[in-house]
């Protein structure tokens, strides 16, 4: 089974992906973690690294191509990333997580150890803007078009365990009556 988990920064995609990976024993690959690691390796903030990636498409395309290649050759995998629902066309279940910006910013401040919410907001909005432009330019993908997703969940009011239970119900149903991936 191939599952993609996508959403904007701070929506909980990495947490849910880890949960599902542990629960089902699936391999997990994460574009966000790869991107954050690359930024760190270049001694850059995420927004700064995003601007670099905006100038040189090789960064995004390398991460995206690698994820797609691994996912399409693998079974029992969770592919986490903003574009994974678009890139992994043969996924059995494509999930989009969303949460209001205030919720996402609180999570980002904690996760990335940013000094305050206003700083996190500036960084996050710039990052989202840069990414949206790149996705449109590179792949003609509108990140706000969720039509490829099978399951869209608001992560604001549920913790990862509760979200995991909702997704588990979908996975269990798919195991009973699989459908052709769209």
UniProtKB/Swiss-Prot annotation:
<keyword id="KW-0418">Kinase</keyword>
<keyword id="KW-0547">Nucleotide-binding</keyword>
<dbReference type="GO" id="GO:0036431">
    <property type="term" value="F:dCMP kinase activity"/>
</dbReference>
<dbReference type="GO" id="GO:0006220">
    <property type="term" value="P:pyrimidine nucleotide metabolic process"/>
</dbReference>
<feature type="binding site">
    <location>
        <begin position="7"/>
        <end position="15"/>
    </location>
    <ligand>
        <name>ATP</name>
    </ligand>
</feature>
<dbReference type="Pfam" id="PF13189">
    <property type="entry name" value="Cytidylate_kin2"/>
</dbReference>
<dbReference type="InterPro" id="IPR011994">
    <property type="entry name" value="Cytidylate_kinase_dom"/>
</dbReference>
<keyword id="KW-0963">Cytoplasm</keyword>
<comment type="similarity">
    <text>Belongs to the cytidylate kinase family. Type 2 subfamily.</text>
</comment>
<dbReference type="GO" id="GO:0005524">
    <property type="term" value="F:ATP binding"/>
</dbReference>
<protein>
    <recommendedName>
        <fullName>Cytidylate kinase</fullName>
        <ecNumber>2.7.4.25</ecNumber>
    </recommendedName>
</protein>
<keyword id="KW-0808">Transferase</keyword>
<dbReference type="InterPro" id="IPR011892">
    <property type="entry name" value="Cyt_kin_arch"/>
</dbReference>
<dbReference type="GO" id="GO:0005737">
    <property type="term" value="C:cytoplasm"/>
</dbReference>
<keyword id="KW-0067">ATP-binding</keyword>
<dbReference type="GO" id="GO:0036430">
    <property type="term" value="F:CMP kinase activity"/>
</dbReference>
<dbReference type="InterPro" id="IPR027417">
    <property type="entry name" value="P-loop_NTPase"/>
</dbReference>
């Amino acid at each position: 089974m191939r599952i993609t988990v996508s959403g904007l920064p701070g929506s909980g995609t990495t947490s849910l992906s880890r949960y599902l990976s542990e629960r089902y024993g699936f391999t997990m690959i994460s574009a966000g973690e790869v991107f954050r690691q690359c930024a760190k390796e270049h001694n850059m903030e995420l927004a700064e690294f995003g601007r670099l990636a905006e100038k040189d498409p090789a960064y995004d395309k390398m991460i995206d191509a690698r994820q797609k290649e691994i996912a399409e050759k693998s079974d029992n995998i969770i592919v986490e990333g903003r574009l994974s629902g678009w890139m992994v066309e043969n996924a059995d279940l494509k999930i989009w997580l969303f949460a209001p910006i205030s919720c996402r910013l609180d999570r980002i401040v904690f996760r990335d150890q940013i000094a305050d919410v206003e700083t996190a907001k500036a960084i996050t909005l710039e990052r989202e803007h840069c990414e949206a432009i790149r996705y449109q330019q590179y792949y003609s993908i509108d990140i706000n078009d969720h039509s490829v997703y099978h399951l869209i969940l608001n992560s604001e009011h549920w913790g990862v365990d509760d979200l995991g239970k909702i997704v588990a119900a979908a996975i269990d149903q798919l195991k009973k009556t699989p459908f052709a991936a769209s």
